[in-house]
Regions:
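Active-site cores of enzymes that catalyze phosphoryl transfer or operate on phosphate-rich substrates
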Residues: 236-258, 324-376, 380-387, 688, ...
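Thiamine diphosphate
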Residues: 39-44, 53, 83, 90, ...
């Protein structure tokens, strides 16, 4: 180690080796005193912070290195500590991470002739060494900040200041040094020594032309070296052969040609064209081909409206004639409401050098970015089905807009999920179609607070490759790097395709009203395709006539209505598809067997309660396991946790995979599930449901990150790709499900009607009024019922263990795939009355209408109370206390589709009814009252037109529940009293 004081900032390092730390005698006496006090102060801090002892040196050093690269990447307390470190000799600059400097010194040390040698004065050697270090600092500066001077903007409107760190004079290197030879250190171009002029020129070619690479924020040195080794040898400009360059021109011609064709044939019709960003099409083409060469079998794409029609026709091979029919408003022969053409999904198979690949473009709403986690979920399901844990066979590619990528919170959530156990997919290729404007907003100070729209990706240390979309070969190069990086490191990577929007937000919009200067420039711009054609003609790759013929040939194909993707497979391999035909054409009333033989229940019960030898279970959990053993033996009534877990066990035993995610699902928010046991000695875990049977399907249970929106969207995507399994998302409290309201509204309840997409996702939403206040009482049942129509979803409120057992099994065993919204209990999980017997699992099925266990004689009943959920047990307690044999209480366990026939059958048993009441815990404007009363009134009218349905419940309220226990108790008493007296 050099005994020197290093005084540095992020990219500038000055090493003053004149003052050894061991000898401060050269300093003036006052300075020596100040230095001693400073050292004494530092030592006092060190002694007060025991975590800074020598044994932790490597750890602290690594933290400091990380802090220097990205201060936000270290814990707040460490960041605060590092911020307060004193300067040396009053120098105010910040340190630079020494790992990169050490690399440079290693390279220098390998060639001794550039160190001090005999015959050279010592002062000259020291001066040369200082300059050499400054050159290495300059190299490092280009790697860190070269992207800030890259020529990324096709419009030339970016107002970017010069980066002083990239000027050799900043590093005290002058014009006189330009022809001197210096060690190149870890540079990957040229020889070991080069003239400074050539070093700077090479660095500018690599980092400051059409590509701006951000990768130095990545902590992993292997990744940084990987990018340097890819970019520097070719100066970010590989020489592509003429065949590749012609193919690029053909793809650009297709992208531009389709937009021109649609613009002339359907003027003024919205299509959200790709004009200005045509390089996206060759980018996608290369990604698909390169993924195929790595063994990919499936690629799932997600994107918003911009350029979607172009991708459908020119990438996925949709027949142009079908697109023209949509433009002309011809209704296709399908059911449902349909959706606009720029929301439609599509799938096809294309051929690559590595074999056939299935492409699927996800359907999406106008809610930008919400499709991203949907795509990730679909990919994860495909990887699970293919036993592809590394993500080689199934690849996600997601396209974004610059405004939405910077503005939508679900982008952050999706990135945060990317490296977790439950949601990782082995890396995603993100392409930002950065046309520099969001509808009418283009000023950076309005659109974001960050330098780039892509800065959010730095939170997971994703490399970001900015590229000028008017340079197709640069786009090709970053595309190849991106797919290679994903294959090598299994992480996300971002391509920032800096382009422009030639027209308005849509084709009927005039953009000059809000962006006059931008669109004055755009009107004068030559298209990307024509720029590249001119370049190829100038380079002698093609002639002008050949360039024109490529354009004419594409237009002829469109006129004929032929497929324009040459790699499209006309007779695709069906093994690459998921077969949904068994689930088509069935009604929700379709029957299925959900009961299970007693011997099977007992066998599975033993497996569920088996704890490995030496596994130390926490005391309360041990009691739960012991009780479950007794339940299996019939010695105890079964509770909710047993009924639910047994449903999972029986489905696994019958060959159905299961996936459960959500916050705290391993244990369950209310400590009822305990599907994951934790060893109290070493923290190891045991999941009995993973050991139900030999060769059983996969059981996955993951505690999710604290997100509702992205996680529910992920599970929606998963369930639309996994019809044979049970996919469950559970809210920590049902109240929090509305954090994913976009997913519920745009996908879950309307996806089948808009797009024909089947989905069997199950939502478990804890709900119940127990005095816990307005944020921990309501799953907003009324919202799901208000969204219910055309048998789009199921809304169930099970109140017994056997009901949840049959409900979950029915969701998989019935040949129907509809979302299930299950309003689940909290206090009922341990309620002495909310139990079932083993016989209830071995016979019967899910009952949509459920009477009391011991009902009153129908001939005596004059009052019928209809209800759902927990309030039933309050009503039952009151009935028993008052010995009201004239009252019958009936639970409607499925509120949608409403079981009118089953209610009719029950009503037919009661001929002497005088009063019928609907009782609910929720306020009148919430719960089931407004959305379900007409169903109940219709049933009553069929039974006896004179009967009138009355309401017993809380008064209408702006909040779901009150926050005071005393008020809650009074309200609860009143609504129960009303049910019996009104």
């Amino acid at each position: 180690l050099l005994d020197v004081v290093a005084k540095v900032d992020p990219v500038k390092t000055r090493i003053d080796s004149d003052i050894p730390l061991a000898d401060h005698s050269q300093l003036p006496a006052p300075a020596q005193g100040e230095l001693f006090k400073m050292h004494e102060s530092i030592m006092e801090q060190l002694w007060q912070t025991s975590h800074l002892q020598g044994g932790n040196l490597a750890y602290v050093e690594q933290l400091f290195e990380t802090y220097l690269t990205d201060p936000n990447a270290v814990p707040e307390e460490w960041r605060s500590y590092f911020d307060k470190l004193p300067s040396v000799d009053g120098y105010k600059g910040r340190d630079i991470d020494h790992s990169s400097i050490r690399q440079q010194f290693e390279h220098i040390s390998r060639n001794q002739r550039f160190l001090a040698s005999s015959g050279v004065p010592a002062s000259a050697t020291v001066d040369a060494d200082k300059k050499q270090i400054r050159v290495l600092q300059l190299i490092n500066a280009f790697r860190f900040r070269g992207h800030q001077e890259a020529k990324l903007d096709p419009l030339g409107v970016w107002n970017r200041p010069q980066v002083e760190d990239l000027d050799p004079s900043f590093h005290e290197l002058s014009e006189a040094d330009y022809d001197l030879e210096f060690q190149t250190g870890s540079l990957n171009f040229g020889s070991e020594t080069m003239k400074l002029r050539d070093i700077v020129g090479g660095l500018r070619q690599t980092y400051c032309e059409s590509i701006g690479a951000e990768y130095m924020h990545v902590v992993d040195t292997r990744i940084k070296r990987w990018f340097q080794q890819r970019m520097e040898p070719v100066r970010s400009r590989p020489n592509y052969e003429s065949g590749t360059r012609k193919h690029l021109l053909e793809r650009l011609t297709a992208a531009e040609g389709l937009e021109k064709y649609l613009g002339s044939r359907y003027p003024g019709v919205k299509r959200f064209g790709l004009e200005g960003g045509e390089s996206l099409i060759p980018c996608l083409d290369e990604l698909i081909q390169r993924a195929g060469s790595y063994g990919a079998k499936e690629i799932v794409l997600g994107m918003a409206h911009r350029g979607r029609l172009n991708v459908l026709v020119n990438t996925l091979g949709k027949n142009p004639k079908e697109l023209f029919d949509e433009f002309e408003g011809k209704k296709l022969a399908d059911s449902g409401s349909g959706d606009v053409k720029y929301h439609q999904g599509f799938s096809s198979n294309v051929m690559t050098e590595g074999g056939e690949i299935h492409l699927a473009l996800a359907f999406n709403p106008s809610h930008l970015e919400i499709v991203s986690p949907v795509v990730e979920g679909s990919v994860r399901a495909r990887q699970t089905r293919r036993n592809d844990p590394n993500g080689t066979q199934c690849v996600p590619i997601i396209m974004h807009g610059d405004a939405a990528f910077a503005g939508q919170g679900v982008v952050m959530e999706t990135f945060q999920m990317s490296q977790t156990r439950g949601y990782g997919v082995g890396g995603t290729i993100h392409i930002v179609i950065n046309n520099q404007v969001g509808f009418t907003t283009s000023k950076q100070e309005d659109a974001r607070s960050t330098e780039y729209c892509t800065d959010v990706a730095k939170m997971i240390q994703a490399p970001i490759l900015h590229v000028n979309a008017d340079d197709p070969e640069a786009v090709m190069f970053v595309t190849q790097m991106a797919m290679d990086y994903r294959h090598e490191f299994k992480n996300d990577v971002v391509i920032d395709l800096v382009c422009y929007r030639r027209r308005g937000h849509n084709e009927a919009d005039e953009p000059a009203a809000t962006q006059p200067v931008m669109y004055e420039k755009i009107r004068k711009l030559t298209t990307t395709r024509n720029l590249y054609a001119e370049k190829l003609v100038a380079d002698g790759v093609i002639t002008e006539d050949e360039a024109k013929q490529i354009e004419l040939d594409y237009r002829d194909e469109l006129d004929k209505g032929d497929h324009v993707v040459k790699s499209l497979v006309k007779e695709p391999n069906k093994d690459l598809y998921v077969d949904w035909t068994p689930y088509l054409g069935h009604e929700w009333t379709a029957k299925c067997k959900s009961s299970v033989a007693l011997k099977t229940i007992q066998k599975l019960g033993k497996k569920l309660t088996h704890v490995p030898e030496g596994f130390s279970v926490q005391r309360q959990v041990s009691k739960i396991v012991s009780d479950r053993e007794k339940m299996t033996a019939g010695a105890l009534p079964i509770n909710w946790g047993y009924g639910e877990v047994m449903a999972y066990a029986t489905l696994l035993n019958e060959g159905h995979p299961i996936r459960i995610t959500g916050q705290d699902v391993g244990r369950g928010t209310f400590s009822h599930r305990h599907a994951v046991l934790h060893n109290q000695k070493d923290g190891a875990h045991h999941i009995a449901l993973e050991h139900i049977a030999e060769n059983q399907p996969k059981f996955e249970i993951y505690d999710s990150l604290l997100s509702e929106e992205a996680v529910m969207a992920f599970e929606y995507g998963y369930s639309t790709t996994a019809p044979n399994g049970l996919v469950v998302w559970e809210a920590q409290f049902g109240d929090f499900a509305n954090g994913a309201q976009v997913v519920i509204d745009q996908f879950l309840t309307s996806g089948e009607h808009k797009w024909g997409r089947l989905c069997g996702l199950t939502l478990l939403l804890p709900h119940g009024y127990e005095g816990q206040g307005p944020e921990h009482s309501s799953a907003r049942l009324e919202r799901f019922l208000q969204l219910s129509a055309e048998h789009n979803i199921q809304v169930c409120v099970p109140t017994t263990p056997s009901q949840v057992f049959h409900m979950l099994r029915r969701q998989v065993k019935r040949p129907l795939r509809k979302p299930l919204v299950a309003i689940t209990p909290k206090s009922l999980l341990r309620h002495k009355e909310a139990t079932s017997e083993l016989d209830d699992l071995t016979s019967g099925t899910f009952k949509t209408v459920l009477p009391e266990k011991e009902p009153s004689d129908p001939k005596k009943v004059t009052r019928l109370i209809l209800c759902s959920g927990k309030v039933y047990f309050d009503l039952l307690e009151r009935k028993k206390a008052d010995e009201r044999d004239d009252v019958a209480i009936v639970r409607i366990e499925q509120l949608y589709p409403f079981p009118g026939d089953d209610l009719d059958e029950l009503l037919s048993q009661h001929s002497k009814l005088k009063h019928v009441v609907w009782c609910q815990e929720e306020p009148m404007n919430q719960g089931a009252w407004y959305c379900s009363q007409h169903h109940m009134r219709n049933a009553l009218h069929r039974h006896n037109p004179k009967l009138y349905l009355q309401y017993a419940g809380r008064d209408a309220s702006a909040a779901p529940a009150c926050g005071h226990m005393s008020v809650h108790i009074e309200e609860q008493k009143k609504l129960v009293n009303d049910a019996f007296e009104i």
